[in-house]
Amino acid sequence: ASPIDERTSYDVFAHSCPSFKDYFDLEFNMALYSTESVGYVLRVKGADEGQIFNLFFDFRGDDILFRLNQEGKCVLIALPVSKAEAMKSHWFKVKIAFNLKQDEITLKIHDQEKVCKGVLLSDEFSPKIVFGKSDHIIDVPEIAVDKLVVNAEHTYTFPLDEADGESVCNQEGTLYGKVENPIWLINEAYHWRKEGGFASASEAGSCYNADRNEIYYFNRDSLFVYNMETGNISAKAFT
């Protein structure tokens, strides 16, 4: 894990925080970069100390278990999602909807959805939405976030396609957010990073297994397997 002061923190409305009445939701694409990295995805903080919510995940067998918590109180929603299904296309959708009028919160991740009713919510909410490190929350997992949209009476769309700096603008170019220690993924599209390598004295081939997210490299007497989720390499000799 990286040092605490080097971990990413993204405050969505750092420069201009809107106020929502009756309803708002946020949705974004998320990708996991490690099946061994767990932690907090984001926090949503209201003006009232009792109205702070966070989204946490860890791994339970073949599932990713997401938990929406009301800080200092309880787990509101526990939502298991198939790890294989969610990670099949790299990105999967996450949506959290706050119905302020009906006092209920809905969590939808990939193709799974749950509703928690009876959550006392203010009819008007000025949310401080923070991804990653936030106050005492320092367990920042290895994830990526893309295409963030906050829906209310007005829709705020953040492509998150910046290439450098700490400023985050909406799709119209208006400054709203600030991010500390960002890693902008657009740069990785141009600057490739070597993950590993294989060599063989005899003729060799390779193929990719999409279901297992593995690359196979083989020659006449050996098979090497590189797992793209864990980075582990295993080898097997043919007999």
Please tell me what each predicted stretch does.
Residues 211-213:
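Short coil/turn segments that connect the beta-strands within blades of beta-propeller domains
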